[in-house]
Amino acid sequence: MKNVTTRRTALKTGLAATAAAVVPMDGAAAAPAPKAPGETKIVVMMGHDGMHNDVSYEMEIRSIFASKKDWRIWAARTNKVISPELIADADLIITQRFGDPYEWNAEGLADSVGSQRFSLYNDVMAPAMIANVRDRGMGWLAVHNTIWNGRKDLEDFIGVDAELHQEIQPVIYKQFNPEHPVTRGIEPFCVNLEEQFGVKIKNPAETTILFRSLAVHDHRDSVGGWCLERGKGRVIGLLPGHLEWCYRVEAYREVFWRAAFWAMRREIEPFPKSGNRDLW
């Protein structure tokens, strides 16, 4: 019985492997290892507040790109390690955080007195994110509540005005753009519990709609994904993402996979099917 895999041992193994790959927490802006020749650097900044589990998001995102052994993912579990230096040589950033300051990480003690709060979209990071996309060609996947960054410059850059979700409910994603390589051939799918954020496109002439969403209970129909060119770089907005389980929907995993390649201006490789991913 010593070698039998249980839910507990599987969780321990998975969490240990994920923790080993994370940016160190011991400094105000701890620097990752230098980018190796030929390596693809992806910086992931997801969850990180009282309602979203960033470690669970991180594990799902890592699993989508697990077959790409030369793609190195740096997942920031605390805003205090995020700096312009961290993304200065990144090929892609993936964000799923709103603009309010919040502080949480997977290590150490949680102190109710004197805790510091940091915002991802501060006056240093926001211009750096824009410049790296526009001037250097870094890709940006702006996921879910990234639209609530609270900054006019970032809202203009990703090309949308945010609309708040209503009831958390099943949401159908549909009308996938058959002309775009990120969504060509993708069939409609449903996420059983989702915040159906919406957006208003600021400049339709420069924006491509990738797909739409339909709320099952209140029937609100809205844009669910879009993309646009920004200087040397590209931005893709993907609104599904309230709970980590949406990243187990095979169709959305494929959209995410394709979006990463497209945002980095790379030829999109065939998506490796995931098979049975049920940890339980």
Spans of features found by a protein language model:
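N-terminal secretory signal peptides and thylakoid transit peptides that target proteins
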Residues: M1-T18
